[in-house]
Amino acid sequence: MDAPWRQAGRGRARGRATSASGGSSQAPGPVSASNRNASYPRGVPTDGNGVQRPGTGWGNSTYASASKPVTTENVKRETNEENSKKKFEEIQKANQAAVKKLAEDHYSSSDDEDGDEDADGKQKKILALTFTSYTSQTDGDLSELARTQQYVNEAFQAGAVTCLICIASVKRNQAVWSCSGCFCIFHMPCIQKWAKDSVFLVSSPLTDDDFEKKDYPWPCPKCRYEYKRSETPCRYYCYCGKVEDPPLDPWLVPHSCGQVCEREFKPTCGHKCLLLCHPGPCPPCPKMVTITCFCQKAKPVPRRCSAKEWSCQQPCRKTLMCKQHKCENPCHKGDCLPCPRVSKQKCLCGRNVAQRPCASPTWQCEQVCGKTLPCGNHTCEKICHAGPCGQCPRSGNRLCPCAKSKYTLPCTEDVPTCGDSCDKLLECALHKCSQRCHRGPCETCRQEVEKQCRCGKHTKRMPCHKPYLCETKCAKVRDCQRHQCKRKCCSGNCPGCDQQCGRSLGCRNHKCPSVCHRGSCYPCPETIDVKCNCSKTVLKVPCGRERTTKPPKCKEVCSCPSTCHHEARERHRCHFGPCPPCRQTCKKILNRCSHLCPVPCHDEALVKQKGLPQPAGPWEQPSEPTFIQTALPCPPCQVPIPTECLGKHEISPLPCHAAGPFSCKRPCGRPLACGNHTCSRECHKVTDVNGNKERAGVECAACEEECNKPRPPECPHRCNLPCHSDDCPPCVQMIRTKCHCKISNLFIECTKLSMADAKEKNNLTSCKNQCPKELPCGHRCKEICHQGNCSLNCIQKVKLRCPCRRIKKEMPCNSVREGHISLECDSVCLDVRKKAAEMKAEEENAAVEQERRRQQAELEAFENRLKGKRRKNKRKDEVEVQQTAWQKYKKYIMMPVCGIALAVFTLYYTQVDV
């Protein structure tokens, strides 16, 4: 829908008068002076009377004068001109608003930081809510949540979570799937296609019958963790798997349901995760369990379930496998280590003895057994062994070499050959041995047969034991579906492709390094660092995402140098683009008054450039406003200057640039001729009479007030007479007042109260009851209601202690407070105090000595630096006079010693006074 000014006057005939048949025509009328110029065509300059300026126009134009009659066409043209002007004004306002918005957006880095802080605060609240149940078990310890917290932070950060299959960002409103092995997040359609393609590639060499019999796995694109085909994701669940299609909630972790996770911890301990539904691995179990150590000798202690296995560090003392020694290692997990000791042990046959580890008592020597077998004719040919040697291997029924005949012969005789043909299968597994029964292996097959090559394309007659391979190269495509086999005489089961894949990965930066394969390549394993402007904050993203990933928000301070007269910029965060304008105080010295400029820095103020060519009319496209950075002059000085008002009532601070006589707007206040009132006019200039600056002048007003003479000090009532000069009559009104103790109300005649002396006034204002006030010692005053402070002569019994507070007695309160009675320490107290003083003195002396040594070392180091290297051209006749150690350091030693002595002296007399 177009704006009204665009809809009005559309078409080529805009500005023409409408015909009588097409619509109502406007009647001619007078043309105002402001619209006279509208009767000329656009671009023809005119003067204020509607006459074309001389020397302008298009040659000999007919628009040279304004004496033309006013017609309907002229009135219509004026209306169109007004619409055009309105259109021009609307465009101008829109451009100004756009420029203002652009300037605000360009210099709103502080607002962006405030928005970032709000987002960070919201994220912190969600994280705290997610980890509340866990931190309540760990007393606020977050050290075990570092890995899980990283996954949760990446879930909140835009562009941080990337699907490795399609190399695209994972958004909050997209269905996702999380791997249970590496916890990587993928788009649901991407992982479904990946699983389908992986199963197809694995099962493609098989027949249709075998395909249904096996459940071929598919791997995770990142960690290669294998899943069954039945585990292919088909529905979108939250991280904990409780809610299907979790709703999008801005106050929850993206793709979570907000419920407690309740997944079992790994390794399984019987407890479940306490966090709210979250990405990434579950943290270690925070539950407390009571468990004993590995050797089960120590008492059970409460420990975290995730670290429940512990060692008491006591010797294990379990019997080792050797059954002779005990384990000396500290309490440990699992079986004990083999015995580390060495002992003399016999071999299995018992002939040899050797020093061997106690953990391996069984060993064999290299000698043949040699024992006589039960037959009595042969000896045992086994290597050193345990137990009986067994029967003679040549005794009992034996077979001939071809295994066709059995013989029962003594062990001393060999089995003869039977004379029959051997008939054993040869190595070719097709023919049998044609020789007579013989000892030893059969010969190779020498029969000639018609052999077919491995690929089945050629045949040839040749010896059976020789293989036949033709020279034909296989033309089949390997399993990668890209390269030919080209193996000579291939059997059809072509080997896998051994070339490198080399296809460009989804990142468009690297090529696949794997062996040539079918289907999609695995995602690029590389990561790219996306840095902020100062390169201190780095965000690792999968390769290929660096072009679309926004740089991370850096919290470091911007290090760009200042471009104004200030030495350094205000502290603000690292950013791209120009720095925000300086907001520091200008502090330039003003020319007129030498004060410092207090306004914000204006060296680089953004000012709209003036003097640009203006459009001649609405038909021209207005040029975009241009802003330039210009140093503005300092504003007028606003430093307050003390200035006296006209009536000399006050000295008020006025701005430095406007300091001068002024009216303070107060009443004049000078005493009038009556002597009772003052001038009530607003502060004005007064001419002094006879040099008296306290009397009213001729400019002051006359007195018209009532009597305002001062009453007696105790009388609060006004005089009812008009203003007069003599004394006022006595006051007879009753006054309600409080007694001295402020408890009872007393009614006294105003005259009596005001005319009474101090003693009589004290009696009049007393309620004659006991004073309720509390003395400084804490006891109640015993006197009758009285004026002033209570007496401090308290006779209440209180407890008194000696200075070291070892001895105590009961004494009168006033005597104790005035210090007339004191309880001195006895000899026991003095001994205790003396020992304490000696210990303190030793500590102070040690501190003084240590300080002296430190100052000595610093002084020597300082002098060594001052001396520097000796010059080679130093005169030989100079004699260096060395000062003694006391002359060098007596100042540095005496000052701390005197200070410590003064402090000890003051402390001692303070304790004595107490």
Curated annotation (Swiss-Prot):
This is NF-X1-type zinc finger protein NFXL1. GO terms for biological process: regulation of DNA-templated transcription. InterPro entries: NFX1_fam (IPR034078), Znf_NFX1 (IPR000967), Znf_RING (IPR001841). Residues 59-73 have a biased composition (Polar residues). Residues 830-879 form a coiled coil. The chain crosses the membrane at residues 892-909. The keyword tRNA-binding does not apply. Its main location: membrane. It is found in: Membrane. GO terms for molecular function: DNA-binding transcription factor activity, RNA polymerase II-specific; RNA polymerase II transcription regulatory region sequence-specific DNA binding; zinc ion binding.
